[in-house]
Amino acid sequence: MASCGGAQPRLGPTVKREALLARLRSTPRWDVLVIGGGATGLGCAVDAAARGYATLLLEAHDFAKGTSSRSTKLIHGGVRYLAQGRIGLVREALEERAILLANAPHLVHPQRFVVPVYRQWDRLMLGVGLTAYDWLAGSRSLGASRLLSARDTVAALPGVKQEGLVGGIAYMDARFDDARLAITLMRSVFDLGGLAINYLPVSALRHEAGRVVGADARDAESGACFNIAARVVINAGGVWADTLRQLDEPQAPAQLAPSQGAHLVLDRDFLPTDSALLIPHTPDGRVLFAIPWKGKVLLGTTDTPRTDLPLEPRPLAGEIDFILDTANRYLTRPPRREDVRSAFAGLRPLIGSTKGGSTAALSREHVIQVSRQGLVSVAGGKWTTYRRMGEQIIDTAIPVGGLPARPCSTRELPLHGHPGSACEDVFGTDRPEVDTLPGAGRRIHPALTLTEAEVRHAIRHELARSVEDILARRHRALFIDARSAQDSAPAVAAILAEELGLDDTQVREQTEAFRQLAEGFLTPR
């Protein structure tokens, strides 16, 4: 693949887990300890490290293992939030969209959306709403929304139903690769002098004189224990944040009302266009998107209350039917279960109560709290505003930890691999170095773009430890085509064995574990 422009940084030596753990053990005290390696935690760690604080991030599983790799892949102001009158949330999100487009142009890209309209009244109302959306974006606008004729709508959305179509509306937002942004943020933490380690779960918080002063953690691979001292501890546990809060205050009431969002991935044939489709009205009061992503079409999402917190949530049968039925009302070629290449779900850490049975109206905003013992916890939030959340959380943490006050610098902080201008290669300026590794010209599977060199790069420089880490988050194979990802597992496991010294038993275990995981991404017929 051709590289993006810009300076070409050297990747440096292979990152050894043993060296990371040795650095952790040799550091007597950290300024900032962040627990949680999703969007929120990584945003906090980048912000803290950029201010010059000694920063440590610990993740119990892999970076973006949970919600942060299972989003609808949008960086957006939120058209439906505008309809709810949440002007401040939309304005902030549009500002953050502009910042992300500037700071990570290899991962975040402008995306045209088209809304097909079948009633003139809807065309009028949507036109007014999207004009307001343009106005809120101001100088950060990606292009003005405009009304389309029925003919232009069909040209933009080949495959959309034409019966009763009166026209459409086009507007601009942005799409991204969520897990790759997470990996890029992790690399940025290291670039800024911080430390981030996956598979190192926190088992307890450490208290002295009634204050949180650190945490105990245990390496999931070796079993080694670490007693970590920190001036301030940040709970960025996502949907599991309440569990961490209760390590500090066992009687702390639950604050979150998790909601599940399911997504389906289809071949591009169902919507052969670079424009995204927005379905403005669904029976549960949401919108449904069909987005071009990684050569496929991503359909989503749902809003289903969950009282449990599974590490591997699965789309429910009713959610799959809901998405397919809704899409079928708008597409001339109706997708069926057997057409689904991958089905996945994520849990949103919404703030509020589900006593009414629905989470669609609960807050997508975030709340920062400081406990009596000084644990800084954040609840809620979304990818679009991750940077702003990180800024606010570190601003809150500074006086709690008695840290010297330093200003935030992430508004104009290019993230790792920044190419200098827009490019579609997620590796950005790392690409030339990636392609010097063995196997740059050999694909792992004919249906995937993943090369042997990219697998080696994930292991050597992106802290990948398993087949899942590589096929789910360093590359998005599991989310794009679960069957092809499943078929690729043995080849990836063989490279892991070569790079990490795994024995035959470990290779078989890795392959079988991923096979079972991928089964959950395949839609039951």
Regions found by a protein language model. Give the residues of each.
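Short hydrophobic core segments
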Residues: 35, 228-238
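C-terminal accessory subdomains/tails of enzymes that are appended
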Residues: 20, 29, 61, 107, ...
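Glycine-rich Rossmann-fold phosphate-binding loop(s) that bind the pyrophosphate
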Residues: 37-38, 60
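Core beta-strand elements of the Rossmann-like FAD/NAD(P) dinucleotide-binding domain
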Residues: 28-30, 222-232
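Dinucleotide-binding Rossmann-like beta1-alpha1 core, especially the glycine-rich loop
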Residues: 73-156
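A conserved short coil-to-beta-strand element within the FAD-binding core of flavoproteins
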Residues: 198-213
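Extreme N-terminal leader/targeting segments of oxidoreductases
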Residues: 1-32, 47-51
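Glycine-rich FAD pyrophosphate-binding loop
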Residues: 49-69
